[in-house]
């Protein structure tokens, strides 16, 4: 990848961790889940979660949310930033941010979904981040935090080791409604996962990642906020996933095709596609239909990628998106996609 990234230094136990709501302020709507998430976060990391004025303020303005992000970067005691959840309007927050503050004191940022906006903003500043980690989804609900999430959370914030990305063997599309007290104690309905699907030549690729939630990437490109030419992704690893909006496979294919027409697909050496959610609280097809929907998205994406870059190593099914358990992955940091051994390794330095 032609663009070099700064990797922020790790936090240490006792440091402050900013907990922000750059999109939807889920802690204000569902405080019980949030408070359990904060207790678990402190126990698992030894860090001190610090909330800001809009962390629990549902409906806060874009400028107010941006002020909290700027304040977190400006505070030398804060050694990491965690977004509680995504949403659908973070694109309006980005113009209010002060890039000089982030450049002056880069910090690990973790978030998923709509936080793709912040990841790409940091990318434009030359700062690596970590895709995943929404506390309201992965730390607060259920009887405990999933092992793969704990390991990648600690690696991203504290330890910086190299981890093999493996399949947890089970997955859920959606948890119990957070308004239900049972959400504090139980996971959603989980089902066995399928083996990951591999395509492309049998070769090993190592490169920095770029990507995020596919729908949000489309917004960012439409707004003209990708700061480099597609050639800047040369040799990199594209990571893409789809949201709880449950886009039909053909619409997913249209977005991926647009990436191809922009030159992104031909630039990268590998593509990781997350296991997609195919159900929610109101739409729960039978198991066979859910499997078919996942297969349709897989086949559509692989077909489009292969047209633009038949030499790309492609792996489909990796749980780094909107399903749970979730791996947090580097964004701007290196990942090895080994098409020979069919293994994936992520470097969290």
Ranges and model annotations:
Residues 222-296:
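Internal helical hairpin/lid segments
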